[in-house]
Every structure is written in C-alpha cells, then in structure tokens.
C-alpha cells in the first residue's frame, strides 16, 4: 500500500504567487519507439501522445508530457486514492504495452512531487534560479521544459496563463520549496 508522505506541508501564498503540492497524483513514465507503441497508447488511453518536442496533450483524466523522442510522463489530472499502489492506467498500459514488448511503463508516483504554481510572478521566480529563457515558453499553453531551478533538475509544464505544474524529485522537493519561499 502507498505510504504517501507529503513533503510540502502547507500551501504558500504571496502577492502574485501561490504554491501548493498536488497530492497524490499518479505519475508514469512510458518509453517506446515503434508505431505500434504509439497506437497502443492511443487506443488504451483514448489520447494521443505528443510527438513534437516540449509539448503536451491532455484528456479529461490524463495529461502526457513529451520528455524525449521516445519518453513521456503521463499523470492524472485529479488526485488518486492514497490507500492503494494500484492504478488502472498503469495496469492497462502494462497489459497493452509491456507484456506485448512494445515499450516500457514505470510508475514514478513516489519519485516525483508535483507543485502547482499560480500567479503573475511565477516566471520572475523561475528567472532568478534557472538558465532557461522563459520568454516564449510562458506564452505557449501546454509547453514543457526540463531545466535546472536552483541547481535542481525539474520538469515545468505550462498549464494555463499564469499557472504551471513543476515536477521535482521527492528528495529535492523540500529544498526547492524552501528556495522558492525565500
């Protein structure tokens, strides 16, 4: 059973910036190159994986982030039950992808923390700790980047205007959250 420990204990709000850990959210990494892999994902999840670099696709229940030409992160849009390690999406993909040797499916729910940031000061915060140029990124809804923030590897997903999802490894999440609150 999932022993989910919240790394970020509270929601933080400042003028122009709000930060909260979205908990718990199912997160999977899927990898594959074959056309059959992409087709099986589409049929299984009723969504198409993004094939253009640094983009995302979204359905009612799931979002897929492009990480590399053969790697995507799929996460649930809503919270999942904390009393289980079993996710219907993972079970379905294991059956239709892994067992047919079309690709790999890895549960990274416990590995990554998802922090939702809202407000018009998000990119001011990011620019103080990242070498990435956010000028074009912030105007493209659904764009994705993997970058460094305060010397920590992160995945940033531009959800909406002035709203982003930031994925960080659990072991670095408290440090990053403290840096963002400083």
Label the model's feature ranges:
Residues 1-182:
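Basic, glycine/lysine-rich polyanion-binding surfaces/domains
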